Curated annotation (Swiss-Prot):
NCBIfam families: rplP_bact. The lineage of its organism: Eukaryota, Viridiplantae, Streptophyta, Embryophyta, Tracheophyta. It comes from Ipomoea purpurea. Residues 1-20 are annotated as: Disordered. This is Large ribosomal subunit protein uL16c. One of its GO terms (cellular component) is chloroplast. The gene is rpl16.
Length: 147
């Protein structure tokens, strides 16, 4: 499971997930990618489950890049605890994902294999996602420049 080696503070505020992703929304490393369409917290377990599903499905071929990292601690209070007496202890880590963010990238495989592997990883995610390829991204860039 992914988690930071050390953090400045043990606990964090929950924060808000408004707007679209400002960074990490273009394909950088691979040729195919999985893009988030909704805002959500994605746990380190979910990230790992998606990564495993992709590697199993790709079978040696290709390379996978995980583009999100769980850097936010989520605190949970013990069961049957009365109100008050401070905030709970950090239980697990999440990555804050906004719409447009690339979750996984894949390269070195055919489009058919990539689509199948990424769709299996998408089923492990708690949000709606879409499969994108670098060719589609290039086309959208050129159409934006023309207009």
């Amino acid at each position: 499971m992914l988690s930071p080696k050390r953090t400045r503070f043990r606990k964090q505020h929950r924060g808000r997930m408004k707007g679209i992703s400002s960074g990490g929304n273009h394909i950088c490393f691979g040729k195919y990618a999985l893009q988030a369409l909704e805002p959500a917290w994605i746990t380190s377990r979910q990230i790992e489950a998606g990564r495993r599903a992709m590697t199993r499905n790709a079978r040696r071929g290709g390379k996978i890049w995980v583009r999100i990292f769980p850097d936010k601690p989520v605190t949970v209070r013990p069961a049957e605890t009365r109100m008050g007496s401070g905030k709970g202890s950090p239980e697990y880590w999440v990555a804050v994902v906004k719409p447009g963010r690339i979750l996984y990238e894949m390269g070195g495989v055919t489009k058919k294999i990539a689509r199948r592997a990424i769709s299996i990883a998408a089923s492990k995610m708690p949000i709606r996602t879409q499969f994108i390829s670098s060719e589609i991204e290039e086309k959208s860039k050129t159409t934006r420049k023309e207009s």
